[in-house]
Amino acid sequence: MTQLQTEILVKGQPAKAEALVLTAPISFWGGVNPKTGLIADVRHPQHGVAITGKVLCLPGTIGSSSAAAVLLELVYAGLAPAAIILHEPDAILLLGLIVAQEMDHGTPMALKLDREAFGCLSHKILQIDAGGMISIR
C-alpha cells in the first residue's frame, strides 16, 4: 500500500472511493450537470462520466465565477465527489465547499497534490483520512 501526504485546502469528510483522474481541465459551469453529477461538456474527453462519489482529480479548471454554485448544488443534492484533489488551489471552486460547510452540509475534502502524482491514482481506490493522508489500494 502506498501513502501520499497532501495539503488540505478545505477540511471535509474523510473518504474512501475510486479515483477519477480527468485528462483535461473542466469548467463546472456548463461542464458538470448539477442535477445528475455527470460531465456534461460534450467536448471533454470524459463526457458522460459520473463524478458523484469519486475522488475527483482535476488537472485544472476552466474559470467561471459560477463554479462555486454548481459545486454547492452537487453537495446539496448528494451528487458531489467524495473528495477533490487539485494540483493548485482554485478559490472560486473551493468557495462552493466553504459555503456548503457554513450551511451545515457534509462536504467533501479538497486537497492539493502535485499533478505528477495523479497518474498513479487513476482507477485506484483511495482512502483519505482527516489529516489529508491518502492510502492507495
Model-derived segments and spans:
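Feature captures the catalytic cores and cofactor-binding loops of soluble hydro-lyases/lyases
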Residues: E7-V10, L20-A130
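Phosphate/diphosphate-binding glycine-rich loops and adjacent basic-rich segments that engage nucleotide
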Residues: G131-R137
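Intrinsically disordered, low-complexity regions enriched in acidic/Ser/Thr/Pro/Gln residues
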Residues: T2-L9, P14
